[in-house]
Amino acid sequence: MRAQVRGGWWSLILAMVLANAPPAVDTASAHAALPVEPQVVRLATGGVGGTYRPIGNLIAQALSSHDASSCATAPDCPAGGVLVVSQTSNGSVANVEAMERGLVELALTQSNIADWAFRGTGRSQGRPPATSLRAIATLYQESLHLVTRADSGIRSVPDLRDRRVSLDEPGSGTLGDVRELLSAFGLSERDLKPEFVKPDLARARMREGKLDAFFIVAGAPMSVLQSAARSDAVTLVSIDGPAVDSLLARLPFYSRTVIPDGTYPGVPDTPTIAVGAQLLVRADLNDDLVYRLTRALWSDNTRAILDKGHAKGSQIRREHALDGISIPLHPGAERFYREQGMIR
């Protein structure tokens, strides 16, 4: 009897609780109402004063906004879409190392740095090949800038002997390029008074009379140099001649270019060398995701963001996407280019 009474009371209490409970919610509806976090993809860019950082910020913005708006209709889209987050870095070499360590999924890097790292050759000689690297696209050409004060007396690369020169930071692609250039001219770091700082700090040191020149590889125009040319007496040094001929014959991923008159206020046409800037991705990133990122990269939405966001953005064109790529394409990117008839 006691058991029956206890059971009766519990039944009564349960009935009262249910009577006062809020209406039942369909489980599927409840899950649908909850916000779904986007998949985060990290993009390594560059340092302050260069081109990688602003271009990387624009690409991250474009891929994220495009994916968020189109994800609902894509059957292979992860719930919540994709958020591409740009991160500053020391440059190409550091970006490749970050990809190898799994710290980022996407990275901007110079084509020669990508090639050397993937094969374990050149400046990556003696290191294990970076087999996790895959390519999405070549974006634009980067020019080697040799910047000096107009009154420095530096008119050519050999004039750098015994001068105070910044070669950019360790981890940058610029440092490797400058070492190759100096070697072509019969010089090395020991022949200079080298420093290793980014262009914004190099410019400040040059204004203070503590530095004679600095190198930077970046897409022209660079905002830090536009500002310097307007307010400081700076100029660019031509990089040309037989030494450059031998450099290009030995390392064909370099090419000749000219930084046009007017790119920087008061600076005339300046011959120099260039290398491709590429967007890389880890090999283990999902094929469908990389396909959608590649498709978004060449969308009208991204086109508008790049054209408005940076002077170099207008030079990022789909017809040049495969120029100079010497490491394997990611299967997701390859699928997109095959659909476009760019690969057979």
List where the protein language model places each region:
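Immediate post-signal peptide segment of exported/extracytoplasmic ligand-binding proteins
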Residues: T27-L43, C77, I154-R164, P331, ...
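Bilobed "Venus flytrap"/periplasmic-binding protein-like clamshell domains
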Residues: V40-A72, Q141-E208, R303, D323, ...
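A structural signal for short loop-to-beta-strand junctions that line the ligand-binding cleft
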Residues: G126-L139, G262-P271
